[in-house]
């Protein structure tokens, strides 16, 4: 009995989204979070791309405010069925954001300004004919690359949306068959000016990110099946990448010309192909990209496979972690919190936090009761972001993340200006009792004052910890470059 209770305590999550963006008229195909700014870019099945900037502190303040109102208001006055976080519908025709909830719509009419929502539209455009198939940022987030079902690759400025370069990918190939291939994945090098584009025939093309010229092609990697995922293996080399497709994992160097898979009859092939997993390999990531000693892959039958490149050079999985039977793990991203964990998006509408070291699920959050989770990402402060065809949710930081931010700050020379220990349970209880006796207007005023003070301190704490992590990341990147002896982009 005790064991069952412990298991329940581990996986239950009380975290809520701070923002939900919905598309009630067009399917969402892709979403990206800027690495250094509170910016989210969304691609749609209609070919539209929309860029939004959000204010995490304001959105968190709104969520906390609704929580306190629910706690402080008596039962007879409590509002049933009111969503505590902000939910906005994206209008692709005008670019406007509209509240989904009726009560919030009435408040928006009084203010009439998008910035009061904590979210505003920076730009929108009809970028592609047909659907948006894939998107990615460059290493600094200054530009965004997108490819559509029209086979046109476009490079645009992130802040303005203005296209600075474009190319019809079909014009780069001589074969008629290759001209008709559709593209599935984009991946940008973090150290050199090139991007990789995977297609439905198992080919990966290397494109110069400056002039969008074709540099190399690695063909038929997964026996002609579609490329499901591509990611960097820069711990080995700036030119090493991993791709997933069909039931195999492949490991290759983008500089190799006419590279062939190392299969039976061609053992000298330069593309290293894993053993057949007898289950479709849909997505993958390193638990810690800077260490790159553990790789997790999401599978079609609801499990995550664990790979150790230092043990068997990615020939086969080492173990597996059960997530959800008869469901598929469609997307995966590391938490980047030094906790040996990743976030997995599942076809049942849940996102799972999986501890690779313990080999089990440690947290579950529900993204949707009706829609599957088709992509997960992290924002600039490491909030997890989940998305499906109908909506995108930016989740609040968990208590573990907040504690880590505090521990990072306490290691610095600056003294802590605020601590959770300063607030006793008795004080919190007294505040709640006092608030119950106030009118609704007085209650809201008091809550607003408290939240402004709380989130100013939280914002300062988060900014310091994020800045420190980014400095550490840049130092590690420079170290990797020095170790590999890479100084310039010679071979591509």
From Swiss-Prot:
What InterPro entries does this protein map onto?
Answer: WD40/YVTN_repeat-like_dom_sf, WD40_repeat_dom_sf, WD_repeat_multifunction
From the UniProt record, report the name of the gene that encodes this protein: JIP5
Q: Name one GO biological process term.
A: ribosomal large subunit biogenesis
Protein name as catalogued: WD repeat-containing protein JIP5
Q: What does the record's miscellaneous section state?
A: Present with 7750 molecules/cell in log phase SD medium.
Compartments where located? Nucleus, Nucleolus
Q: Which residue intervals correspond to the WD repeats?
A: 127-166, 178-217, 236-274, 276-317, 365-405
Q: How does it assemble?
A: Interacts with BUD27 and GIS1.
Compositional bias of kind Acidic residues: 404-414, 422-433
Q: Where is this region: Disordered?
A: 404-472
Keywords assigned by UniProt, alphabetized: Nucleus, Repeat, WD repeat
């Amino acid at each position: 009995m005790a064991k069952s209770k412990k298991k329940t305590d581990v996986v239950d999550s009380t975290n809520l989204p701070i923002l939900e963006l919905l598309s009630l008229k067009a399917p969402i195909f892709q979403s990206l979070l800027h690495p250094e700014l509170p910016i989210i870019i969304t691609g749609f099945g209609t070919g539209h791309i929309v860029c939004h900037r959000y204010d995490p502190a304001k959105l968190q303040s709104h969520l906390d405010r609704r929580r306190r109102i629910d706690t402080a208001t008596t039962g007879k006055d409590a509002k049933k069925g009111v969503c505590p976080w902000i939910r906005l519908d994206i209008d692709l025709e005008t670019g406007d954001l509209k509240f989904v909830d009726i009560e919030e719509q009435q408040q928006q009419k009084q203010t009439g300004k998008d910035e009061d929502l904590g979210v505003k539209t920076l730009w929108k455009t009809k970028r592609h004919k047909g659907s948006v198939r894939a998107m990615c940022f460059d290493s600094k987030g200054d530009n965004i690359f997108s490819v559509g079902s029209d086979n046109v690759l476009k490079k645009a400025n992130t802040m303005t949306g203005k296209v600075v370069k474009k190319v019809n990918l079909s014009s780069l190939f001589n074969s008629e068959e290759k001209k008709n291939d559709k593209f599935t994945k984009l991946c940008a090098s973090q150290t050199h000016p090139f991007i990789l584009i995977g297609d439905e025939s198992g080919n990966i093309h290397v494109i110069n990110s400056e002039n969008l010229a074709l540099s190399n092609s690695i063909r038929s990697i997964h026996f002609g099946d579609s490329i499901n995922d591509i990611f960097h293996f820069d711990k080995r080399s700036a030119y090493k990448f991993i791709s997933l497709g069909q039931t195999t994992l492949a490991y290759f160097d983008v500089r190799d010309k006419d590279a062939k898979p190392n299969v039976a009859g061609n053992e000298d092939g330069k593309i290293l192909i894993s053993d057949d997993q007898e289950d479709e390999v849909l997505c993958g990531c390193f638990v810690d990209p800077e260490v790159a000693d553990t790789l997790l892959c999401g599978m079609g039958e609801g499990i995550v496979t664990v790979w150790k490149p230092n043990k068997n050079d990615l020939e086969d999985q080492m173990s597996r972690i059960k997530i959800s039977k008869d469901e598929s793990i469609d997307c995966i991203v590391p938490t980047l919190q030094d906790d040996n964990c990743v976030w997995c998006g599942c076809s049942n509408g849940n996102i799972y936090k999986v501890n690779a070291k313990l080999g089990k699920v440690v947290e579950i959050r529900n993204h949707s009761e009706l829609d599957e989770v088709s992509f997960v990402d992290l924002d600039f402060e490491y909030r997890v972001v989940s998305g499906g065809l109908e909506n995108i949710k930016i989740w609040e930081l968990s208590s573990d993340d907040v504690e880590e931010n505090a521990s990072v700050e306490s290691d610095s020379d600056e003294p802590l200006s605020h601590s959770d220990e300063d607030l006793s349970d008795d004080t919190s209880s007294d505040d709640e009792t006092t608030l119950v006796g106030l009118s609704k207007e007085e209650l809201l005023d008091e809550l607003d004052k408290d939240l402004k003070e709380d989130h100013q301190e939280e914002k300062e704490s988060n900014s310091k910890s994020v800045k420190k992590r980014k400095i550490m990341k840049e130092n590690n990147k420079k170290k990797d470059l020095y170790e590999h002896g890479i100084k310039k982009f010679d071979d591509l």
